[in-house]
Amino acid sequence: MSERKYFGTDGVRAVAGEFPLTSAWVMSLGAAAGEVLRRVNPHARVVIGKDTRQSGDMLEAALAAGLTSRGVTVIHVGVLPTPGVSYLTRHLKADAGVVISASHNPYEDNGIKFFGADGQKLSDATELQIEAAIDEVPGFAPLTGTAMGSVTNYTEAEHLYTDFLKSHAPDLSGLKIALDCANGAAYRVAPKVFQAAGADVFAIYTTPDGRNINRGCGSTHMDHLRQIVREGEYDLGVAFDGDADRALFVDSRGQVVHGDHMLLLNARARGEQAVVATIMTNMALEAKLQDAGIPLERTAVGDRYVHERLHEKGLSLGGEQSGHVLFLDISPTGDGVLTALLTLASMKKLGTTLDALHDDLVMYPQTLVNVRVQDKKAIAVDQQVQQAVRQAEEQLLGRGRVNLRPSGTENLIRVMVEGQDAAEIHEVARVLAGVVEARGQA
C-alpha cells in the first residue's frame, strides 16, 4: 500500500487552524474528495455532520465549499454523534458521509473522517485516491453555473437518528439513570432517547459552548458522574465521549463498568458464537467467556482491527475496554448510545444488574512498563528479548500472559504482563523490562 500523507487510522487529525486543518487545505480536501466521488457518480451527494467544537463551523464551511466546487450536493445534518452521520449516510442513500470531530480529544483539536455509502469507514483505496487528488486541485477545470453543487440543511436528521435508537431501546421504566454527555455530540440525543424509554434521567454536561467538550467530563473523566450516582442513589450512570461513538457505565456504587464487562454481558445474553477484542483485553474476560463456551479472538489495539476481524469471521460482537463496542448486526460503526441501550437490554434479559456484573468479572492484575530504547523495530526481532519472553510465558503458563508492543509515536517498548498473582506479574515484568532495556541500549 502507498504511504499515507494525511489520513491516519481515524481520518485527518490536528489542531484546528494549524496545517493540515486550515480553511485553505480543508477546501482542497473537499475539492479532491468531490472530484473522486463524481468520477463514480456525477450527481454525488455527501452528508456532513459535526460535534460541538468551535472550529467545526469553519471546517464544515471550507469542506462544503470544496465539495460544491466539484459539483457535489452537500447535506448538512448539524451536530450529531459520529454514528448518527453514518446512519444518515445510509438512510439518505448518499455517496459518502463526513464527520468533523476529534472524539475524546480537547476542543483545540479537530478531525475529518469519511464514511462510504455503506456507513463504514472509507476504504483505504479511496482515501489514497483523495490524497493523490489533493495535489491536483489547482489543475482542476473550473465548474461554473449549474455545474456547481449546492448545500441543503436536513432538519429531520436528529429526529430520524433518535427514532432509530428508540427502536433498539428496552423498557427502562423504574430505572434512575445519570447521563454524562461530555458537552459533546450526544447532548440532545442521549437524554431524549433514555427518557423516551421510560427512565428517570438526570443529564449532566449538556451545555456545550464550543470549548468545553470533554473538559473534565465524558468517558475519559468520570469522577463527577461516579459521585453523582453514589450520592444520588442512581441505579447506574452512562458516560459518552465527545462524538458519542463509545460509552462506559457506572454501577450503583460508582464503580466503572468498562468494555470488557459489556462484552461479557452482551455475549451471554445474545448467545454469540465468538467475541473479538484486543491484546489489551483482560484475561478474566477470556476465562469467563471460555466457561460459557464462547471463544475470544484477539487483535491489535484499535477498533479498526476489531472491525476487520469481525468482518473476516462473520461475527457481530467485539470491542475494547474504552467502551468502543461494535454490534455489526445492527450498526456498521461504534455507537455509544446504541451500545448503552443494547447493554441495558442484555442486563434486563438476564435479570441481572451492573453491580452483579462488576462483581462477577474480577479483573486479573495487570502491569505495564514503558521502556525507552534506541530502535524499537530491532527489539521486536532481538533473539535475547524473544528468549526472555518465552521464559516469562513458560513461568506464567495457564496463570497469565505477556505482551510486548512498540509505541506508535515514541521510541518505547510497552511491556505488559497480566496474571492471577500480582506479586508474580510485577516480578516477571521487572525482569523482562530489564532485558528489553539492556538490549535496547546495545
Curated annotation (Swiss-Prot):
| An annotated Gene Ontology molecular function | magnesium ion binding
Catalytic activity as recorded in UniProt = alpha-D-glucosamine 1-phosphate = D-glucosamine 6-phosphate
Phosphoserine occurs at which residues?
103
Its domain of life reads Bacteria
What Gene Ontology terms for biological process does this UniProt record contain? Answer: carbohydrate metabolic process; peptidoglycan biosynthetic process; UDP-N-acetylglucosamine biosynthetic process
Residues holding Mg(2+): 103, 241, 243, 245
InterPro entries on file: A-D-PHexomutase_a/b/a-I, A-D-PHexomutase_a/b/a-I/II/III, A-D-PHexomutase_a/b/a-II, A-D-PHexomutase_a/b/a-III, A-D-PHexomutase_C, A-D-PHexomutase_C_sf, A-D-PHexomutase_CS, Alpha-D-phosphohexomutase_SF
Q: What's a GO cellular component annotated to this UniProt protein?
A: cytosol
Q: Where is the active site?
A: 103 (phosphoserine intermediate)
What Pfam families does the record point to?
Answer: PGM_PMM_I (PF02878), PGM_PMM_II (PF02879), PGM_PMM_III (PF02880), PGM_PMM_IV (PF00408)
- What does the entry report about post-translational modification of this chain? Activated by phosphorylation.
SS bond list: none
Family as reported in the entry's similarity comment: Belongs to the phosphohexose mutase family.
Q: PANTHER family attached here?
A: PHOSPHOGLUCOMUTASE (ALPHA-D-GLUCOSE-1,6-BISPHOSPHATE-DEPENDENT), PHOSPHOHEXOSE MUTASE
HAMAP family found in the cross-reference section: GlmM_B
Summarizing the function annotation, the protein's role is: Catalyzes the conversion of glucosamine-6-phosphate to glucosamine-1-phosphate.
Protein name per Swiss-Prot or TrEMBL: Phosphoglucosamine mutase
Question: What organism is recorded for this protein?
Answer: Deinococcus deserti (strain DSM 17065 / CIP 109153 / LMG 22923 / VCD115)
What's the gene?
A: glmM
